[in-house]
Amino acid sequence: MTALQADLVVVGGGLAGIVTALEALRAGRSVALVDRDSPERFGGLALWAFGGMALVGTRLQAKKKIPDSPARALADWQRFGELDPNDRWPQAWARYYVEHSATEVYDWLLQEGVKFMPAVNLVERGRNGEGNSVARYHLLWGTSRCMTLRLIEQLRAAGSGGKLTLLHRHRVTQLEHTDGRVSGALAIDEATGAEVHLRAPAVVLAMGGINGSHEEARRNWPSDRPQPKTMLNGAHPFADGRLHHLAADQLGAQITHAGEMWNYAAGFPHPFPHFPGHGLSTIPCKSALWLNHRGERIGPEPLVTGFDTHWLCQRVASQEKPWTWHLLNWRIAAKEFAISGAEHNQRIRDRQLLAFLKETLLGNHRLVRQMQQQSPHFLVADSLAELTAKMNALT
């Protein structure tokens, strides 16, 4: 067994783990970071995400004359997020985030060389205006992938001189504690089976959520909400809840609010899946007709994206069959169809400004043709009768 001593052990190489390790290194600490994935996929889901985030009271909002404030954002969150006023930790977290996201997220990222697109979007406003009351959704220029690669670069620079140890393809199987404090962890090299004994006066678990496991998601699904008959995985497959249960079983950690997940209603299988069950999330076209399995428009209230994603998920999950359709013409698709994530937004990801502006103005025919060629779930026909035949053949 190999032994390794550090000032800090970080379990999980996603965005939270990388930032935690980076800040510790800059404070003069030595860090051991353990991650299950390969070096090429270092960064977790952040490497593949689109890169939108809700931020409060930023300089960009002020420039756009958006009248936001921590008090206003907290009121929106408490109302739309249905936070229990007596629930201590969710209330404390929400308050801290709205009061510090401008400095500790927006300003901090700017200092790291990360750039935002010059627009702030109003999403999740609620079906009747009960959600976000002002625009808060900031978008990264370069997507989350660019940000993640930049922070990894900074991490390696801060860890030069031997202060940073990166253990890829390692899985933590045990947490150790001494005198009531976590004092280390046992990690397994998943390629060789070799064990590594990590010791540190501080251990940070940054292992993501539970949505990488369908079993864990279903186990925690709120009983008062319709559960979908089939699901795809748009999270990270290693965010499977194992370490949550390990911390609970070995150390008495409390797992709360696990059923409050953020899911999406309009997914389809990835044409070239990175892992079993890998799904892509479309940004539903507002001008499309959202149909059930019989080809009937779901209603009477239409399903429209950008207002209440949580409600969309419940409406789709309550349908008789586990699939729905978006019906639209090519013109609408070229102007409105989009897929969330860095992989299918290369104009933004690769910061190709002119190409991005061209596709925004003239339509993204490239993406529509790409999906037509690659995905059997993206059906194109010259007539409604021909399209109906293809839809019936698929289901």
Residue ranges and their predicted role:
Residues 194, 198-268:
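Glycine-rich loop(s) and the adjacent beta-strand/alpha-helix scaffold that form part
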Residues 42, 94-196, 214-217, 268-269:
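Conserved redox-cofactor binding core of oxidoreductases
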Residues 2-16, 32:
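Beta1/beta-strand and adjacent pyrophosphate-binding region of the FAD-binding site
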Residues 52-98:
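Glycine-rich active-site loop/strand segments that organize a redox cofactor
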Residues 16, 39, 296:
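Conserved Rossmann-like nucleotide-cofactor binding loop
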Residues 26-47:
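Glycine-rich FAD pyrophosphate-binding loop
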Residues 253-394:
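An anion/pyrophosphate-binding glycine-rich loop and adjacent beta-alpha core
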Residues 21, 25:
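Gly/Ala-rich phosphate-binding loop of Rossmann-like dinucleotide-binding domains
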